[in-house]
A protein has these predicted regions:
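Accessory interaction regions appended to the cores of large information-processing enzymes
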Residues: 1-119, 129
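Intrinsically disordered, low-complexity Ser/Thr- and Pro-rich stretches
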Residues: 121-123
C-alpha cells in the first residue's frame, strides 16, 4: 500500500507514475482541513523501487509518500516457462510477470538468469542416485 500526500494542483501528475508501475488506486480524496489530497494505491513490490524518487521528480518535490506492506498476492504465470520471451524496455504481459519478477530479482542480486534445463538435470540426477 502506498499513501501519497500532495497539494491538489500536482495530483494529476501522480496518476501516470502509478499507472507505469502497475499501480491500482483504491482511494483518493482531499484531506479535510488542509490543502492536501491523499491518494492510496496498491503497487507491486517489484515496481516500488525508486517510486518515491519518481513521485518527487514529477511533482517538483511537492508530494511525499509512505510505503507499507499490505498483503501477498499470487503473481500470474510460471517463472520457469521457457516459452515466455521478455523484451527489454517493454512492459511484460500479465502471464509473463512471474518470470519478469524472477529475472529482475536475480539481476539485482548479481545472479545469472535461471535455466529450466539446469533444474531438470539436477533433479533427474538426484532422483537416479
Amino acid at each position: 500500500m502506498i499513501e501519497i500526500q500532495a497539494p491538489v494542483d500536482v495530483v494529476p501528475s501522480i496518476y501516470p507514475v502509478l499507472a507505469r508501475r502497475r499501480g491500482h488506486i483504491v482511494h483518493d480524496a482531499p484531506k479535510p482541513g488542509t490543502p492536501f489530497y491523499t491518494v492510496k494505491a496498491y503497487i507491486p513490490i517489484m515496481d516500488s523501487f525508486g517510486f518515491e524518487t519518481d513521485i518527487r521528480s514529477y511533482t517538483q518535490g511537492q508530494a511525499y509518500c509512505i510505503q507499507i506492506f499490505d498483503h501477498w498476492s499470487v503473481v500470474p504465470g510460471d517463472p520457469l516457462d521457457d516459452n515466455v520471451v521478455l523484451h527489454l524496455l517493454e512492459p511484460s504481459p500479465p502471464l509473463a510477470l512471474s518470470k519478469d519478477f524472477m529475472i529482475k530479482t536475480r539481476r539485482r542480486k548479481g545472479l545469472n538468469e535461471v535455466c529450466v534445463y539446469m533444474y531438470v538435470y539436477v533433479y533427474v540426477c538426484i532422483c537416479m542416485h
